[in-house]
């Protein structure tokens, strides 16, 4: 969330980690002086108890002059158990040095100032014992380019930390570490405890390599110096295991732009045999739900995107361990030689954990893992709202491969549908399922709840039903007129951007023809009642406008074809990879055609008196437009019969400055907008 001073301009790493006492102890050695002279630590201090003098050259006479030395206070530290507390003190004059005799500016002789004693430094070494704290990273995200974000901006990031139950107990510290230099962002953490039984019970969680930044490609100090083989004991009751990894590459320069913008693999060998290879990369930053950030948000990166999570990678180790025998793990990276050019040495932040478990708790356990659509959650906003086929993700959390299940789904309180899925999912594997369409009009209201659950896995009884069901809140799609137009302008990279208008069967009804650069196109759509999807795709993944290229600026908007070309929908030009816009024509996805799907805009607002009203209703009906002041008095009113859409002005120049309410009343409902007259 943004702090009161505003969010940071830059993308910075933010780590959420549990600081877990390890039960192991270490120490640090600190040297303390046996004495100090006027608070300073010196190797030795010759002294006498009678005043001494220091000679110096008098530049006016060219001869020697002198000044009496000040007393020096000696503090003596003789207690090794309390090395900073003085045990004695002394007042002495400095001695043991030469005074030089000057004649006419020239040194002609010297006199040694004898000392009667000398304090000789004898440092006391004190060992401070401490318990080693291990940092178990729960999750990592990168802050967005947030210059100009509203102070109310905030976003939730969810992490499943079930595997870390063995360390998330007793007393520990949870730290959120923001690596930026400005006020940056505020953050908080909430743990949700879900009652039930895990698919397999975690027994131990151990750090493989410490959580830190590992420089990459430095020939004089290669990453392999730190990622050395590590051996871990495996108890007889630890029958399963996995490796949990969160990698993210940072810094860039040179030909390869490593490690932030280069595609490199890491590997895990188990007992000397390579078992896992993983590309450290995200190729979907242009589909970031937090789009149009004022920075290079759309560039694909090394396992992260600005404003999103660094992905957690899990590797199933069970086939390669033997309970009761130790296992040796070794991580490595593709060879790379950094030759310079980056702001700082490239590298990877690595979190690596070994998780061991007991046996599987269920043989047959199908789970509903995600509802992608319909869903109002921000992370799914690129594909929502929808008016057609729901999308869910199912997961196998049983020991037996999942080959079939039934998915029951629909709007809560409405008509439910059932879909029979078949496939082959191993334990922990997922499948994205595009479900057949439902009866959207079986619910009331503009917002509702969608629910989906799995049942009948492998044609048998699910042994654990508490993870079968998920619910989501949803918003119904807008309803557009039967005829409207796509008004769009290409940029210089005209061959990158295309559009398609599809019906609910996936048939392409309209698409762009041959294009030219920096040209405005107006394509008119005539549609029958139904559900539709407009897809605008940019193969360069940089939309119709992006500050960091030379493609220029285009735009895309939906406009009315009846009357003046008022805007129905204005699309963000800095959209990255694609835009998906779902809508209906001729019917609303709720039971009644609610006015909340209408278009109702006032401009300018504030106004000096003349107000332009853009009003589009879902269907033709009688309408009353009225204006009310803050006292509840109607100061303007007009009626229109058989009205559906128009762009018109009303004159309120005779009204005093203040706040007003513009009301639209129809048999289907009421719309209200605030208006300020200056």
Q: Which residues does each PLM region occupy?
A:
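Intrinsically disordered, low-complexity Pro/Gly/Ser/Thr-rich segments with frequent PxxP/GP/PP motifs
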Residues: 414-444
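Short glycine/proline/serine/threonine-rich loop/turn segments at secondary-structure transition edges
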Residues: 163-170, 440-449, 541-548, 658
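Terminal connector regions
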Residues: 440-478
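C-terminal outer-membrane/trafficking sorting elements
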Residues: 592-603, 607-678
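Loop and turn regions of beta-sandwich accessory domains that flank beta-strands and are enriched
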Residues: 47, 53-54, 287-292, 297-323, ...
